[in-house]
Swiss-Prot record:
GO cellular component: plasma membrane; proton-transporting ATP synthase complex
InterPro entries to which the protein is assigned, alphabetical: ATP_synth_B-like_membr_sf, ATP_synth_b/b'su_bac/chlpt, ATP_synth_F0_bsu_bac, ATP_synthase_B_chain
Transmembrane segments: 12-32
Protein's UniProt name: ATP synthase subunit b
Amino acid sequence: MNINATLIGQSVAFFIFVLFCMKFVWPPVIAALQERQKKIADGLDAANRAARDLELAHEKAGQQLREAKAQAAEIVEQAKKRANQIVDEARDQARTEGERLKAQAQAEIEQELNSVKDALRAQVGALAVTGAEKILGASIDANAHEQLVSKLAAEI
């Protein structure tokens, strides 16, 4: 192998080319590679954060769903209790109103019975006086007639 000026010239040119590349070409390529590597790392970190956030969101949504179901069940239970309470109150009011109406009706019946008894006593007294007049053949004066009817009504 002969070392001549061409080989030395080519070596010097290659060395200059390498220096030129190291000085002007290599730094932007390295910077671009580092920037790309940083973007990829940031993207992976963002993807990991997004995956964790998604998992937390799923857990939070599940928790909120469970809480909403529990709250809905509690509201339904309270509504059932309130409905039963309203039914019981209505039943008690109806019973009280029924007893009041029954007592009022009994009082009216008692009052009507007493007035019928009084009317019957007066009629019986009048019939008795009329019968007595017919039997005796004479008329009793009005004052005596009234006293006799009152006395007879009191006895009956």
